[in-house]
């Protein structure tokens, strides 16, 4: 049987097949578009729902505390400004990462627990790897100079008494990344040019006195400050920090040039009724703080304010008896310092405590650690005739979760200043709202609210 295929049959068949193919292709494209549309719709709905849920969580839980504090600031009859805090823990983690010390610390702890590392061999002043400025904290906020509002990030420092700012005339390399004060741009500038030079172990600062409008929050007053024209040393601490200068909140007797404190000058010029300021550090937000000038914002604390008389007008310093387990020090000099991230105690006092508390110093590092559940750790007490101020272990321990989940850093360190001198830094101020009263020569303490 012969099979004959004509050209028209081939053409007709091809046309029919092409029609079927096109119909199939259109149907497939329609289905694909429908699926794509459904996927887009599903993703859109998911994003909207997730966004709405996230907004609800942040608005009602995360931002709730910020809203409370912002409301207090806006409605307060006093001037309150917020400031940022870079604490020792943040710098510790950065240093450990840079020097790749994580495993070294973990292995050191293991050796200590096995009794293979003796306490007497845990380092000394000859340690060759230092955790830089472990005891320092940067509490920096904004203030303005001049009638044109030149902005600067200042370290608010209760143990310093001058205002220092980088000058446009500064020739040092470390000044390059900073904001500079330019007197030529301010109509309220008053020339002084008295030379200033400060020398310390960390370095030398040279500069000149100037006078201009100084503004914090809602308060402004003409005030004498120091323009830094040359900075030698203080590196890499200064150039790597977000701080431009220092805003001293101490006493006149501590200042260069015998300058009245900024807060006192505000009262002298009738800008505020009381020469007083306070510091509030939220207990659960370790990167924020608040400075209130001219009065006491009662919404930042609970219970009564207890006042202690200063033992002289050089530092914010009082006489308190210090007790730490079986170790004690009578009538100790206790200084409040907003630029200290830890509690400092004399070395002799610290060593007596360490002997019985299972605290371990990591070899060749200025780092003291212990297990977070250490039951031998006592409550640290500061006693006055009328009040006892306490810090429990949970308030002076910092979990080192990025190194070892059960390991904590001790925020109490041995530093020898003047005889029998202790410093209350960040851990104490997280628990206690603190008041600094120039008028009555006192400091006040109250339990800080967890806002």
Curated annotation (Swiss-Prot):
Belongs to the peptidase A1 family. Proteolytically cleaved into the soluble active mature form by cysteine proteases in the digestive vacuole of trophozoites. Proteolysis requires an acidic environment. Transprocessing may serve as an alternate activation system. During the asexual blood stage, catalyzes the cleavage of denatured host hemoglobin (Hb) or globins. Digestion of host Hb is an essential step which provides the parasite with amino acids for protein synthesis, and regulates osmolarity. Residues 59-451 are lumenal. It catalyses: Hydrolysis of the bonds linking certain hydrophobic residues in hemoglobin or globin. Also cleaves small molecules substrates such as Ala-Leu-Glu-Arg-Thr-Phe-|-Phe(NO2)-Ser-Phe-Pro-Thr. It comes from the Eukaryota. Coiled coil: none annotated. Disulfide bonds join 170-175, 372-408. This is Plasmepsin III. Its main location: membrane. Keywords: Aspartyl protease, Disulfide bond, Hydrolase, Membrane, Protease, Signal-anchor, Transmembrane, Transmembrane helix, Vacuole, Zymogen. GO terms for molecular function: aspartic-type endopeptidase activity. It is found in: Membrane; Vacuole lumen. Disruption phenotype: No growth defect. However, slight decrease in proliferation and slight increase in doubling time during the asexual blood stage in an amino acid-limited medium. Triple knockout of PMI, PMII and PMIII causes a slight decrease in proliferation during the asexual blood stage in an amino acid-limited medium. Quadruple knockout of PMI, PMII, PMIII and PMIV causes a decrease in proliferation, an impaired proliferation in an amino acid-limited medium, a reduced formation of haemozoin and an abnormal accumulation of endosomal vesicles inside the digestive vacuole. It is a single-pass type II membrane protein. The chain crosses the membrane at residues 38-58. InterPro entries: Aspartic_peptidase_A1, Pepsin-like_dom, PEPTIDASE_A1, Peptidase_aspartic_dom_sf. The lineage of its organism: Eukaryota, Sar, Alveolata, Apicomplexa, Aconoidasida. The keyword Plastid does not apply. One of its GO terms (biological process) is proteolysis. Dimerization causes loss of catalytic activity. Inhibited by pepstatin A. Inhibited by Zn(2+). Its EC number is 3.4.23.39. Residues 1-37 are cytoplasmic. Probable homodimer; in the zymogen form. Monomer; in the active form. Acidification disrupts homodimerization. Component of the hemozoin formation complex (HFC) composed of falcipains FP2A and/or FP2B, plasmepsins PMII, PMIII/HAP and PMIV, heme detoxifying protein HDP and falcilysin FLN. The HFC complex is involved in hemoglobin degradation and detoxification of heme in the food vacuole during the asexual blood stage. Residues 1-123 form a propeptide. One of its GO terms (cellular component) is food vacuole. Optimum pH is 5.2. Activity decreases sharply at pH above 6. Optimum pH is 5.5-7.5.
């Amino acid at each position: 049987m012969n099979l004959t295929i004509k050209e028209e049959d081939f053409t007709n068949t091809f046309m029919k097949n092409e029609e079927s193919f096109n119909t199939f292709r259109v149907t497939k494209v329609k289905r694909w578009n429908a699926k794509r549309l459904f996927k887009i719709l599903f993703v859109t709905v998911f994003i909207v729902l997730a966004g709405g849920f996230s907004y609800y969580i942040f608005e009602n839980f995360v931002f709730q505390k910020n809203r409370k504090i912002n409301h207090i600031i806006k409605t307060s009859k006093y001037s309150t400004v917020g400031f940022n805090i870079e604490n020792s823990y943040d710098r510790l983690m950065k240093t450990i990462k840079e020097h790749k010390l994580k495993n070294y610390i973990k292995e050191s702890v293991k050796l200590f627990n096995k009794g293979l590392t003796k306490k007497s061999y845990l380092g000394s002043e000859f340690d060759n790897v230092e955790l830089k400025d472990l005891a320092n904290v940067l509490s920096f906020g904004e203030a303005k100079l001049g009638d044109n509002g030149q902005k600067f990030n200042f370290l608010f420092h209760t143990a310093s008494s001058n205002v220092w700012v980088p000058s446009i005339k500064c020739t040092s390399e470390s000044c390059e990344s900073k904001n500079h004060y330019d007197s030529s741009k301010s109509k309220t500038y008053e020339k002084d040019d008295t030379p200033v030079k400060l020398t310390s172990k960390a370095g030398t600062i040279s500069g000149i006195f100037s006078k201009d409008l100084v503004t914090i929050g809602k308060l402004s007053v003409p005030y004498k400050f120091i323009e830094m024209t040359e900075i030698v040393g203080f590196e890499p601490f200064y150039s790597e920090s977000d701080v431009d200068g220092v805003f001293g909140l101490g006493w006149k007797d501590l200042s260069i040039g015998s300058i009245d404190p900024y807060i006192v000058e505000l009262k002298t010029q009738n800008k505020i009724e009381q020469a007083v300021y306070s510091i509030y550090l939220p207990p659960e937000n370790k990167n924020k703080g608040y400075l209130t000038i001219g009065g006491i914002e009662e919404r930042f604390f609970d219970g009564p304010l207890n006042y202690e008389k200063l033992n002289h007008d050089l530092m914010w310093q009082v006489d308190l008896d210090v007790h730490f387990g079986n170790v004690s020090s009578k009538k100790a000099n206790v200084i409040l310092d907003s630029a200290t991230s830890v509690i400092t105690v004399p070395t002799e006092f610290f060593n007596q405590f360490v002997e019985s508390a299972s605290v371990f110093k990591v070899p060749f590092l200025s780092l003291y650690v212990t297990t977070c559940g250490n039951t031998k750790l006592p409550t640290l007490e500061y006693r006055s005739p009328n009040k006892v101020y306490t810090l429990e272990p949970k308030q002076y321990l910092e979990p080192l979760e990025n190194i070892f989940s059960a390991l904590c850093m001790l925020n109490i360190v041995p530093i020898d200043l003047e005889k029998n001198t202790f410093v209350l830094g960040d851990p104490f101020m997280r628990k206690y709202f603190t008041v600094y009263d120039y008028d009555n020569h006192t400091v006040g303490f109250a339990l800080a609210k967890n806002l």
